Amino acid sequence: MADLQKIVDDLSALTVLEAAELAKLLEEKWGVSAAAAVAVAAPGAGGAAAAPAEEKTEFTVVLASAGDKKIEVIKEVRAITGLGLKEAKDLVEGAPKPVKEGVNKDEAEKIKGQLEKAGAKVELK
């Protein structure tokens, strides 16, 4: 049981980029695709009788582009995510990329405002 707790602690300490890399490695190792699992878990097409769509409660903040002030955007990404300089630079240069996932609407709007103030183009998904 202590081994499982250590794994949980180690996974919790990963940055967003490290978690994404881990997901890719596990997909390759196990021969699966995370996208396929999401498609299977998604509800089937329901037609008009489906329940009304609920308001989204979790958002992903996606950096669409860094704009002209790339250095300012990198600084803001570091402040928001806690990433190191190289990881933040790679994230910004690899746009479009998710900056923060699974955040509530208020936090997503706040992060979007911070990044846009720094000169980035941002989307909420």
UniProtKB/Swiss-Prot annotation:
InterPro entries: Ribosomal_bL12, Ribosomal_bL12_C, Ribosomal_bL12_C/ClpS-like, Ribosomal_bL12_oligo, Ribosomal_bL12_oligo_N_sf. GO terms for biological process: translation. GO terms for molecular function: mRNA binding; structural constituent of ribosome. GO terms for cellular component: cytosolic large ribosomal subunit. Pfam families: Ribosomal_L12 (PF00542), Ribosomal_L12_N (PF16320). It comes from the Bacteria. The keyword 4Fe-4S does not apply. SUPFAM superfamilies: ClpS-like, Ribosomal protein L7/12, oligomerisation (N-terminal) domain. Gene3D superfamilies: 3.30.1390.10, Single helix bin. Keywords: Ribonucleoprotein, Ribosomal protein. Signal peptide: none annotated. Forms part of the ribosomal stalk which helps the ribosome interact with GTP-bound translation factors. Is thus essential for accurate translation. Homodimer. Part of the ribosomal stalk of the 50S ribosomal subunit. Forms a multimeric L10(L12)X complex, where L10 forms an elongated spine to which 2 to 4 L12 dimers bind in a sequential fashion. Binds GTP-bound translation factors. PANTHER family: 39S RIBOSOMAL PROTEIN L12, LARGE RIBOSOMAL SUBUNIT PROTEIN BL12M. Belongs to the bacterial ribosomal protein bL12 family. This is Large ribosomal subunit protein bL12. It comes from Bradyrhizobium sp. (strain BTAi1 / ATCC BAA-1182).
